[in-house]
């Protein structure tokens, strides 16, 4: 092989930087990926939804233990709002829809919302 038809690399590569040896130098390009925005899923207090139903919601849709769910439920009851979890947009949207759907099927006025984290 005389190299006269070779354009820089043994495989005839046409990319990279030639260092004068007749071979291309491999260059590494790092692609920076943007982290997805996160959203807080919040439960809002009302005077009608049973506390036990709120605990059930937290256990079922947010994978909380009975103790964690009870603590969050009491926080919602006392402060008016409580954090269920922080998720990507699609996951948060799904969880809000699941909570609202189950609450409506049980005829409870429970409100669940999502808001973007700063």
Swiss-Prot record:
Gene3D superfamilies reported for this sequence: 3.30.1390.10
Source taxon at top rank: Bacteria
Classification via SUPFAM superfamilies: ClpS-like (SSF54736)
Entries under Pfam families matching the protein: ClpS
Assembly information from the UniProt record: Binds to the N-terminal domain of the chaperone ClpA.
Family matches, as HAMAP family: ClpS
PANTHER family hit by this protein: ATP-DEPENDENT CLP PROTEASE ADAPTER PROTEIN CLPS, ATP-DEPENDENT CLP PROTEASE ADAPTER PROTEIN CLPS1, CHLOROPLASTIC
NCBIfam families: PRK00033.1-2 (NF000669), PRK00033.1-5 (NF000672)
The protein's role, per its UniProt record: Involved in the modulation of the specificity of the ClpAP-mediated ATP-dependent protein degradation.
UniProt-recorded name of the protein: ATP-dependent Clp protease adapter protein ClpS
Lineage, broadest ranks: Bacteria, Pseudomonadati, Pseudomonadota, Alphaproteobacteria, Hyphomonadales
